[in-house]
């Protein structure tokens, strides 16, 4: 047992004993029969039909191919390829989509390496984009970016900030989600998909990270108990979100197209998982 595993077990024990609340324990008499699915084949037609849109994003990456070399081995606050948090296609797609769509506003829930790619695209494009980042402890330092663009950072959780803290988003704006990934009552995932997305107008570009659809989560992530992509699956199947790009699908099903373009020259570490999903909102729930 390694140190990280021991820490998780001690955290679970303290939670179950009621000493502290460091996670969630949900008793279920049939838990032993639960097997996480390897994938969701019923969703595959949606992804296959979206391949032309995925190809357009690869073409956009080609139009900004100079970043392949420019972000190689850089130092903060510049984005870099040599990290596993927001690797390869994730970073390239985020940069290219900001440069191409020129959003007036980006709201990011969960910040770090993704913020560096988004901010650099804003700066390189000479855009007047306003950025709001909500994260109690960003995975990568983003403090040095505030002097280069209109960037506001709320170092708190979405639960504590409240959904009212989010500014209004218009068609063409971006909502970038890389939060707790825990779909439980009251979590940031619950608030985002249950309260924020239902009132967004049509045409907002939404990003959700660590989404492997239509595949399941990696086996090595089983201990994390992520459930967010099940919520994303419902939004896709119901038509509330229309696919724009999916790193996992593109890397595993469009490998030839990736290899033929600039994205194929981006270094990706052996332990990295490319898992960005971009989609466009279809419109608000009536009356929201």
Give each language-model segment a name:
Residues 1-288:
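A short alpha-helical cap/connector motif
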């Amino acid at each position: 047992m390694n140190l990280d595993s021991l820490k998780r077990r001690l955290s679970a024990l303290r939670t179950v004993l009621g000493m502290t609340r460091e996670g969630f324990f949900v008793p279920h008499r049939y838990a032993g029969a639960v097997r996480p699915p390897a994938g969701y084949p019923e969703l595959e037609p949606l992804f296959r039909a979206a391949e032309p849109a995925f190809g357009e994003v690869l073409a956009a990456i080609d139009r900004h191919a100079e970043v392949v070399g420019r972000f190689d081995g850089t130092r903060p606050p510049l984005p870099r390829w040599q990290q596993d948090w927001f690797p390869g296609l994730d970073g390239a797609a985020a940069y290219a989509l900001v440069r191409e769509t020129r959003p007036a506003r980006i709201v990011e829930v969960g910040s770090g390496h993704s913020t560096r790619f988004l901010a650099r695209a804003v700066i390189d494009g000479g855009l007047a984009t306003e950025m709001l980042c909500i994260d109690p402890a960003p995975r990568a330092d983003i403090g040095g970016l505030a002097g280069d663009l209109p960037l506001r950072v709320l170092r708190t959780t979405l639960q504590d900030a409240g959904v009212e803290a989010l500014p209004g988003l218009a068609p063409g704006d971006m909502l970038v989600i890389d939060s707790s990934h825990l779909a439980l009552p009251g979590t940031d995932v619950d608030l985002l998909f249950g309260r924020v997305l239902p009132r967004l107008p049509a045409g907002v570009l939404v990003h959700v990270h660590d989404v492997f659809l239509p595949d399941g989560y990696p086996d090595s992530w089983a201990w994390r108990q992520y459930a967010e992509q099940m919520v994303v699956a419902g939004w896709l199947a119901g038509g509330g979100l229309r696919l724009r790009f999916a790193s996992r699908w593109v890397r595993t099903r469009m490998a030839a197209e990736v290899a033929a373009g600039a994205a194929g020259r981006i270094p990706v570490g052996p332990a990295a998982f490319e898992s960005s999903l971009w989609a466009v909102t279809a419109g608000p729930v009536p009356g929201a």
